[in-house]
């Protein structure tokens, strides 16, 4: 899988993490049945782990990455460490006190994970847009050099 395709996957999954974490925060504040959180927490954990795997694959290819990809990798990795830490804290809080989540740090932990995942989404989306613009620029420059085809 290409680096760009991996970043596209990270873009999609970081948006899902942000959405899931936000739903968890809202559900915890409304004192809903905590059993409903289990599927969402699994999704959160799986998406965080999946992005971790994608970042590891990108890091293994670091020497062959474009400069923008290296920069995106480094910045995304830093943010995802924070997302993972807050997701893990939320899971630990959930496991320790499911019945009173609204009175624990769970809503704040999930809110923080959501906010940080949203930062990842914004960052990666920006890099992907920049890469697309650069590709279009290169194609245009190439077509100007070649001239009209007859």
For each predicted feature, which ranges?
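C-terminal amphipathic alpha-helix
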Residues: 1-34, 91-150
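Alpha-helical segments in soluble extracytoplasmic regions
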Residues: 9-80, 123
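Long, amphipathic, charge-rich alpha-helical segments that form helical bundles/coiled-coils
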Residues: 54, 61-120
